[in-house]
Amino acid sequence: MEETRDIPAEELSALRNPATRRGAFDRLVGAYLRPLYWHARRLVVVHEDAEDVVQETFIRAYDKIGTFRGGAGELGAWLYRIATNTALTMLRRRRPGLFSSLDDVSRILASRVAEECGEDADRTLVRFQQAILELPLKQRLVFNLRYYDRMPYGEIARVLGQREETLKVNYHHAVQKLKEKLTR
């Protein structure tokens, strides 16, 4: 993950102050736009959907920033949580009734990875992405946040509202399943 997790306390104060909120929020968007886009993209796969997730994330964050009570070090986890929930809501709403669970959505998305990557994509990378999308949702979330975003377990716990020990087990199982799928 890009170094965006720690913002200065005075920047958080600027976000909470209605007179300075807009400028501070613009800086926040600049710092988190790219990491949140890639987080969303790994969940929803399609570029346009990821852009929608990020846009909705920042709209919700702007609307609620005045009520945010965490410290400066918790702001990134808060944004990731909003993005994660927004992406999951999008996946649940996609073609209602067609999927019985988010895991069904994951299987459909895995088949779309090859379409998104095109014919020139590295086959190993495509297989890796498809294997990730076939993981159970919780394992996929933990794997993406830990592997791609290099988030410490403590921050992942704040994003997902889970205990660190549970997340470590989920990550371990995800890695084992990926190794198994990729060595076949």
Q: Which residues does each predicted region cover?
A:
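Structural recognition of an alpha-helix C-terminal capping motif at a helix-to-coil junction
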Residues: 38, 52-59, 73-85
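Short, charged helix-capping/linker segments at alpha-helix termini
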Residues: 16-27, 37-56, 70, 164
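Short helix-coil-helix linker/hinge
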Residues: 132-140
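Arg/Lys-rich amphipathic alpha helix in sigma70-family domain 2
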Residues: 63-67, 81-102, 121
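DNA-recognition helix of helix-turn-helix
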Residues: 84, 88, 139, 145-148, ...
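N-terminal module of bacterial RNA polymerase sigma factors
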Residues: 1-35, 42, 133, 155, ...
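Sigma70-family region 2
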Residues: 42-45, 58-73, 93-95
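Internal acidic/polar
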Residues: 2-10, 97-121
